[in-house]
From Swiss-Prot:
Part of the 50S ribosomal subunit. Forms a cluster with proteins L3 and L19. In the 70S ribosome, L14 and L19 interact and together make contacts with the 16S rRNA in bridges B5 and B8. NCBIfam families: rplN_bact. GO terms for cellular component: cytosolic large ribosomal subunit. Belongs to the universal ribosomal protein uL14 family. Binds to 23S rRNA. Forms part of two intersubunit bridges in the 70S ribosome. Coiled coil: none annotated. PANTHER family: 50S/60S RIBOSOMAL PROTEIN L14/L23, LARGE RIBOSOMAL SUBUNIT PROTEIN UL14M. InterPro entries: Ribosomal_uL14, Ribosomal_uL14_bac-type, Ribosomal_uL14_CS, Ribosomal_uL14_sf. One of its GO terms (biological process) is translation. This is Large ribosomal subunit protein uL14. Keywords: Ribonucleoprotein, Ribosomal protein, RNA-binding, rRNA-binding. It comes from the Bacteria.
Length: 123
């Protein structure tokens, strides 16, 4: 469960290391975001010469949460930290060309097949 002010790790090579959620998109009073939801983030920590810089406001999709996700068979997939993949503000496609760490099968929608194909492991 991601809400405003939540700090997330970045699971791609866009140049951002750490981001903070500033808005959960989808509804006027929506409070929490789960895996597969799009959020608005600001870059808090970035590497030199990256594609994004500190202070940039971008969209991101949540790929891992500590809360986890429940499957229809009752299994719960949880992770050690919260992570997201930075998206282009207009096209909502990933800015980075590599994804680090596992992602869940819940991302298998038309919009996020690129993330699934780049990920080293899909749980």
């Amino acid at each position: 469960m991601i809400q405003e002010q939540t700090m997330l790790d970045v699971a791609d090579n866009s140049g951002a290391r750490s981001v903070m959620c500033i808005k959960v998109l989808g509804g006027s009073h929506r409070r929490y975001a789960a895996i597969g939801d799009i959020i608005k983030v600001t870059v808090k920590e970035a590497i030199p010469r990256g594609k994004v810089k500190k202070g940039d406001v971008l969209k991101a999709v949540v790929v891992r949460t500590k809360k986890g996700v429940r499957r229809p068979d009752g299994a719960v997939i949880r992770f050690d930290g919260n992570a997201c993949v930075i998206l282009n503000n207009n096209t909502e496609q990933p800015i980075g060309t590599r994804i680090f760490g596992p992602v869940t099968r819940e991302l298998r929608s038309e919009k996020f097949m690129k993330i699934i194909s780049l990920a080293p492991e899909v749980l």
